[in-house]
Curated annotation (Swiss-Prot):
It comes from Acidithiobacillus ferrooxidans (strain ATCC 23270 / DSM 14882 / CIP 104768 / NCIMB 8455). NCBIfam families: lepA, small_GTP. The gene is lepA. SUPFAM superfamilies: EF-G C-terminal domain-like, P-loop containing nucleoside triphosphate hydrolases, Translation proteins. It is found in: Cell inner membrane. Its EC number is 3.6.5.n1. GTP binds at D17, H18, G19, K20, S21, T22, N134, K135, I136, D137. GO terms for biological process: positive regulation of translation. Keywords: Cell inner membrane, Cell membrane, GTP-binding, Hydrolase, Membrane, Nucleotide-binding, Protein biosynthesis. This is Elongation factor 4. Belongs to the TRAFAC class translation factor GTPase superfamily. Classic translation factor GTPase family. LepA subfamily. It catalyses: GTP + H2O = GDP + phosphate + H(+). Required for accurate and efficient protein synthesis under certain stress conditions. May act as a fidelity factor of the translation reaction, by catalyzing a one-codon backward translocation of tRNAs on improperly translocated ribosomes. Back-translocation proceeds from a post-translocation (POST) complex to a pre-translocation (PRE) complex, thus giving elongation factor G a second chance to translocate the tRNAs correctly. Binds to ribosomes in a GTP-dependent manner. GO terms for molecular function: GTP binding; GTPase activity; guanosine tetraphosphate binding; ribosome binding; translation elongation factor activity. It is an enzyme of class 3 (hydrolase).
Length: 600
């Protein structure tokens, strides 16, 4: 058993693609946790999607043994964290389980907005932060400039930051020696009542729900009767273990340790991330602080292409929910798409990943509607409704006010691209709050309506700044504005899945752009298809998809004009009847046309 003084719990904070997972691989290699044959790149990124996209989505942990220069053996618990803005809650949980963090910055690119946000989270948890300059082997690396950036933007002294290259394996031992020197050992009383923080939980087909915990006080061993403090659910511990990165069962998890607990938990609600485990017979006086319910920010309708898949779709969502506390869903029906679910996500990347996992891991074919945000609607009789689906908006005469969510965005951009980025924010109805120049980079603070950001703001930001700008945002408040609901009618029938809420000033332009896109996407039918955008009873834009028609005069060689007219009239009658009963097939791209409607 390792003494508490010789334990170090730390995580790695880095922006997407700054080399965090590669650095973790090097730590595992140096500590000899896996043989060379067992090493695969990005060991901690276990999901296929994580490796393909090169991003970390779920928090992972690994226990390593390291013999330091002072001759002592230390136990490291490395908790790998996601770097993308959508997963900031997973980051805050991982950081709450640590005493220190490595701030990994790409020595060629410099500090990015996401790292700044995560750094502030780490400082709120009173963590010791060690800056590391990675990718020092790149020709474009400029360590001095990046050191100045860290000091100016993050406010951390960086003169002694370790220079390393995770790819080449240089500077790795130096980083680990620095971890031993600078990061404090865990505080906590082995004799006190058990308090263990749930960092993550996931579903395993053989073991049921596996719960990843950090023991703050006391210890956990098999046979113990435990209780979740927020959920008040009792369990009996069956097994405890650690990842080295292979799973290894151990006799007990002592104070300061990070490991997993298997206790017959059947659902993720049974062990919610951020809850505290304690003993039934000797409970702790209070749960660990700082945890909140995760609130989804972005909503979309997901529908199976084949309605027979509805039940398997529900089961797949429930299984994903086991691993993903932030995913929320409830049944919903649409006239156009049948039965499906309204799903809530942390952001667009989270939405894409969930949809991709459903299609890949559960072999489902899904149609998704355009994402929306939550609006507050004040009705004329004084009720406040939270609406995430535009189709559920009450009739216009019953609405007193619609309030849209506003976010505060921090955007880091090189000075060269400042103009286009400001123009983009202004175009999206942003209000500038602050601008700060620091050594070639500018930190912009803007207030933006969330529905302007949720569609394609990130893509546009990357394209106007050649990929150099980065952004992090948080919800600020709800604000009332002149918002209207726009309906799309196909042959006079409302298509509920394409309704959306827009600002009155841009509604006509957006309506015109959307019907033009739909005209190009809806395939031609045997009858004419009218596409209209309407606000209330007023049609603001219209396009038509022309009918396909058979040449009914092909057999008439010369002959009487009245014969030809008769055939044409007969065809016209048939088309009219078809239009009354005909059903228009709407392709999946059409439902996402809303997303692209303002690409100019």
């Amino acid at each position: 058993m390792t003494e508490q003084q010789h334990i170090r719990n730390f995580s790695i904070i880095a922006h997407v693609d700054h080399g965090k997972s590669t650095l973790a691989d090097q730590f595992i290699r140096l500590c000899g946790a896996l043989t060379e044959r067992e090493m695969s790149s990005q060991v901690l990124d276990t999901m296929d999607i994580e490796r393909e996209r090169g991003i970390t989505i779920k928090a992972q942990s690994v226990r390593l043994q390291f013999r330091a220069a002072d001759g002592q053996e230390y136990q490291f618990n490395l908790i790998d964290t996601p770097g993308h803005v959508d997963f900031s809650y997973e980051v805050s949980r991982s950081l709450a389980a640590c005493e220190g963090a490595l701030l990994v910055v790409d020595a060629s690119q410099g500090v990015e907005a996401q790292s700044v946000a995560n750094c502030y989270t780490a400082l709120e948890h009173n963590l010791e932060i060690l800056p590391v300059l990675n990718k020092i082997d790149l020709p474009a690396a400029d360590p001095e400039r990046v050191r100045r950036e860290i000091e100016a933007i993050v406010g951390l002294p960086a003169d002694d930051a370790v220079e390393a290259s995770a790819k080449e394996g240089t500077g790795i031992r130096e980083i680990l020696e620095r971890v031993v020197e600078r990061i404090p050992p865990p505080q906590g009383d082995p004799e006190a009542a058990l308090q263990a923080l749930i960092i993550d939980s996931w579903f395993d087909n053989y073991l049921g729900t596996v719960v990843l915990v950090r023991v703050m006080n006391g210890s956990i061993r098999p046979g113990q009767r435990i209780l979740t403090m927020v959920g008040q659910k009792p369990y009996v511990v069956e097994k405890v273990g650690v990842f080295t990165p292979k799973s290894l069962m151990v006799p007990a998890l002592e104070t300061g340790a990070v490991g997993f607990v298997i206790a017959g938990v059947r659902t993720i609600e049974g062990a919610r991330v951020g809850d505290t485990l304690t003993e039934q017979d000797r409970p702790a006086s209070a749960p660990l602080p700082g945890f909140r319910e995760v609130q989804p920010q972005v909503f979309t309708g997901l529908y199976p292409v084949d309605s027979a898949d509805y039940e398997s779709f529900r089961e797949a969502l429930q299984k994903l929910r086991l691993n993903d506390a932030a995913l929320q869903f409830e049944p919903e029906t649409s006239q156009a798409l049948g039965f499906g679910f309204r799903c809530g996500f942390l952001g667009l990347l989270h939405m894409e990943i969930v949809q991709e996992r459903l299609e890949r891991e559960y072999q489902l074919e899904l149609i998704s509607t355009a994402p929306t945000v939550i609006y507050e609607v004040l009705t004329t009789d004084g009720q406040v409704l939270k609406i995430s689906n535009p189709a559920e908006l009450p009739a216009a005469q019953k609405i007193a006010d619609i309030r849209e969510p506003v976010i505060t965005a921090n955007i880091l951009v090189p000075e060269t691209y400042l103009g286009p980025v400001i123009a983009l924010c202004e175009e999206r109805r942003g209000r500038q709050k602050n601008m700060q120049f620091t050594g070639g980079q500018v930190m912009l603070r803007y207030e933006l309506p969330h529905n302007e950001v949720v569609l394609d703001f990130f893509d546009r930001l990357k394209s106007v700044s050649r990929g150099y700008a980065s952004m992090d945002y948080e919800f600020a408040r709800f604000e009332s504005g002149p918002l209207v609901k726009m309906d799309i009618l196909i042959n006079g029938e409302k298509l509920d899945a394409l309704s959306w809420i827009v600002h009155r000033d841009v509604s006509e332009r957006r309506g015109r752009e959307l019907v033009v896109r739909l005209r190009d996407l809806i395939p031609r039918q045997m009858f004419e298809v009218a596409i209209q955008a309407a606000i209330g009873a007023r049609v603001i834009a219209r396009e038509s998809v022309k009918a396909l028609r058979k040449n009914v005069l092909a057999k008439c060689y010369g002959g009487d004009i009245s014969r030809k007219r008769k055939l044409l009239e007969k065809q016209k009658e048939g088309k009219k009847r078809m239009k009354q009963v005909g059903h228009v097939e709407i392709p999946q791209e059409a439902f996402l046309a809303v997303l692209k409607s303002d690409k100019r």
